[in-house]
UniProtKB/Swiss-Prot annotation:
This is Phosphomethylpyrimidine synthase. HAMAP family: ThiC. GO terms for biological process: thiamine biosynthetic process; thiamine diphosphate biosynthetic process. Keywords: 4Fe-4S, Iron, Iron-sulfur, Lyase, Metal-binding, S-adenosyl-L-methionine, Thiamine biosynthesis, Zinc. One of its GO terms (molecular function) is zinc ion binding. Its cofactor is [4Fe-4S] cluster. Pathway: Cofactor biosynthesis; thiamine diphosphate biosynthesis. [4Fe-4S] cluster binds at residues 602, 605, 610. Residues 1-14 have a biased composition (Polar residues). It comes from Psychrobacter cryohalolentis (strain ATCC BAA-1226 / DSM 17306 / VKM B-2378 / K5).
Length: 628
């Protein structure tokens, strides 16, 4: 199949066949929050200016890949009649917002999103629908009358891989890829990653420094398959999360970003977390991690998964700890195993598992300035020291693989010993754990389970590349997923900036996904504004990394915006920006009138000192001289 076959047809599409009467609803017990949810619905349905949702059809009608089409104004051709214009073609951008930004879709959070992948999963014929939940805790929650008013009402029976010859079945995208199968998910991703580049008129781009990465000019379904088969990329798509739109994480693809949300014992609610999730995906979050540690973790997660168009990750040890009333020493393999099954049956797409925290590494943290800062890492370190043996995450790792391959849950192997300050970076504990994660990666791959590796943390700029180089070496090119890293510790309230500096660098060096940091990092639970600020900051970092790598087509949006800037097409400048609302707001603070949107100056320079206007005059003068 050629690229024209993959993504030549753009259509508007109505993926939700609900009527407008099915407006956004909230749980009946929460009527007091109706107004806020309706406000959220208006925010989500409000299409960005000059934009429309389009769907690119693949090789079959049920492959409809969403993108945002930005319409651009024409450019007046200088020196000729005012009726002469240069047409600027529409620009297409990657879109993570799901049907929430489709004006034709009726959104009902109580019913969840359409099951985009259900048909693909079903047609493979290697899964079965269970009679009911098989997790003891899941069953107990379903019978708990006290939480009935919190529960998502439309829960399907879970799917699981069919057994093969008496052995546990395998339905991972890695399993298919290694058998030469190109799944609909892989074709969907190829269209999504390519972003209609074959229609771009300006592909001028500086050569990047790839540090060994290799991305072809056009990403094909076969390239996606080969990268997944090699373990260099993952497609986090649990079979029980059919609502999710396929995406890929790997250093030969666009750098992705993850947004952390979740309640705590001190704040937030199910409504607020769902609102944060939809808000984060609107602004570009490729993945969401639910890090809830407060009340109703099970119910919160169900609402998030059923309404999320992007993969959802969790740290299962958090909920397991809740089940033993916060006493880490009381954790057992049986409790953790049941938690994994509970979450896999809900549809969690990837688990952070801190299996690399070994007993021998814990004493190495004694001399650290900030000790063990990972919540999961500290929990497992406490368990190991109390019981004086290796954690059940490590000793039962193959059992965990057996569970995950039945649902296609990917590993995000957690860096439980990551540094919490610059002083502790790149020490023996951190790198010892990383080497162990490399060994566990090979075990997971033996089971055809997808793996990515988590990384730091707090690292000075001159020490960042050492992290990337070692990860590639000991983890055999498995995707790296890092929290920043923060490049200085002196800026609480601005750690979205301190970390974005490190994120841009490590993304350039080869990290596949960046975990965002909000301005509230180290200070408190982020609200919706903080979530947006973190997302936009990390979209900048990820894009800067793509540019530095020379990712094909990465510079096209920069070129389009720069052209609009030089031609004083103010509306196009706003609309091509990562955050059109803020760009327009800042411009209009001093030049609010409609006439100012065609002015050949801004309030920075005024009408007489605009360098771009002067440059245009110089060019016109030069043309006149040449004509003579």
């Amino acid at each position: 199949m050629t690229i024209s076959d993959i993504g030549s047809q753009a259509t508007t599409h109505t993926p939700v066949k609900a009527s407008k009467a099915d407006a956004l609803k909230t749980p009946a017990h929460r009527s007091e929050t109706d107004a806020r949810f309706e406000e959220d619905a208006r925010d989500l349905h409000r299409i960005l200016p000059a934009s429309r949702k389009v769907y690119i059809e693949g090789s079959r009608p049920d492959i409809q890949v969403p993108m945002r089409e930005i319409t651009l104004d024409p450019t007046p051709i200088q020196g000729v009649s005012e009726s002469e214009w240069e047409q600027n073609p529409p620009f297409y951008v990657y879109d993570t917002s799901g049907v929430y930004t489709d004006p034709n879709a009726a959104i009902d959070l109580t019913k969840g999103l359409p099951k985009l992948r259900e048909g693909w999963i079903d047609e493979r014929g290697d899964t079965e629908q269970l009679a009911g939940l098989s997790s003891s805790y899941g069953l107990a929650r379903a019978r708990d009358i006290s939480t009935a008013n919190l529960r998502f009402a439309h829960i399907d029976k879970p799917r699981r891989a069919k057994a093969v010859d008496g052995k546990v079945g395998n339905v991972t995208q890695l399993h298919y890829a290694r058998r030469g199968i190109i799944t609909p998910e892989m074709e969907y991703i190829a269209i999504r990653e390519t972003q209609k580049q074959h229609e771009l008129t300006d592909m001028r781009q500086h050569e990047g420094e790839t540090f060994g990465a290799h991305t072809p000019a056009i990403i094909t379904p076969e390239f996606v398959r080969s990268e997944v088969a090699a373990g260099r990329a993952i497609i986090p798509n649990n079979i029980n999360h059919p609502e999710s739109e396929p995406m890929i994480i790997g250093r030969n693809f666009l750098v992705k970003i993850n947004a952390n949300i979740g309640n705590s014992a001190l704040g937030s609610s199910i409504d607020e977390e769902v609102s944060k999730m939809t808000w984060a995906t609107r602004w570009g979050a490729d993945n969401i991690m639910d890090l809830s540690t407060g009340n109703h973790i099970h119910e919160t997660r169900e609402w998030l998964i059923r309404n999320s168009p992007v993969p959802i990750g969790t740290v299962p040890i958090y909920q397991a700890l809740e089940k033993v009333d916060g006493v880490a020493e009381d954790l057992t393999w049986e409790i953790f195993r049941d938690t994994l099954i509970e979450q896999a049956e809900q549809g969690v797409d990837y688990f952070t598992i801190h299996a690399g925290v070994l007993l021998e590494y814990v004493p190495l943290t004694a001399g650290r300035l900030t000790g063990i800062v990972s919540r999961g890492g500290s929990i497992m370190a406490q368990w190991c020291m109390f019981h004086n043996k290796e954690s059940f995450l490590y000793t039962h790792f193959e059992d965990i693989c057996e569970i995950m391959k039945q649902y296609d849950v990917a590993f995000s192997l957690g860096d439980g010993l990551r540094p919490g300050c610059l002083q502790d970076a790149n020490d023996e504990a951190q790198f010892g754990e990383l080497r162990t994660l490399g060994e566990l990666t090979q075990v997971a791959w033996k089971h055809d389970v997808q793996v990515m590796i988590e990384g730091p943390g707090h690292v000075a700029m001159n020490r960042i590349k050492e992290n990337m180089d070692l990860q590639l070496e000991v983890c055999a090119d498995a995707p790296f997923y890092t929290l920043g890293p923060l490049t200085t510790d002196i800026a609480p309230g601005y750690d979205h900036i301190t970390s974005a500096i490190g994120a841009a660098m490590i993304g350039w060096f080869g990290t596949a996904m960046l975990c965002y940091v909000t301005p509230k990092e180290h200070l408190g639970l982020p609200n919706k504004k903080d979530v947006k600020d973190g997302i936009i900051t990390y979209k900048i970092a990820a894009h800067a990394a793509d540019l530095a790598k020379g990712h094909p087509g990465a510079q096209a949006r920069d070129n389009a915006l720069s052209k609009a800037r030089f031609e004083f097409r103010w509306d196009d400048q706003f609309n091509l920006a990562l955050d059109p609302d803020t760009a327009r707001e800042f411009h209009d603070e001093t030049l609010p009138k409609d006439a100012h949107k065609t002015a050949h100056f801004c309030s920075m320079c005024g009408p007489k000192f605009c360098s771009m206007k002067i440059t245009q005059n110089v060019r016109e003068y030069a043309k006149g001289l040449n004509a003579q």
